[in-house]
């Protein structure tokens, strides 16, 4: 399989990458950023299992903020590249 990728833009730890065979570019996330997100979600699950709703909520909020920052970076880079999003924002 010969797939070609093109780096369209980079913002912080995230990059917008287009590759052959895909209609829309994807978001490349650094491995450490992805690992931190997974660890935060695992912490939320652990706190829920312990019955500590406040700590679980805090961890979920942190993970949601991280995911939102990824989505916002993706949307800005898509806009900067003059590309439509693959989903509706309404």
Please describe what each predicted stretch is.
Residues 1-9:
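Short N-terminal "domain-start" leader segments
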Residues 6-7, 19, 27-28, 77, ...:
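Generic ordered-secondary-structure signal
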Residues 11-46:
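A short, structured beta-strand/loop element
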Residues 45-90:
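Short, charged, surface-exposed hinge/linker loops at domain edges
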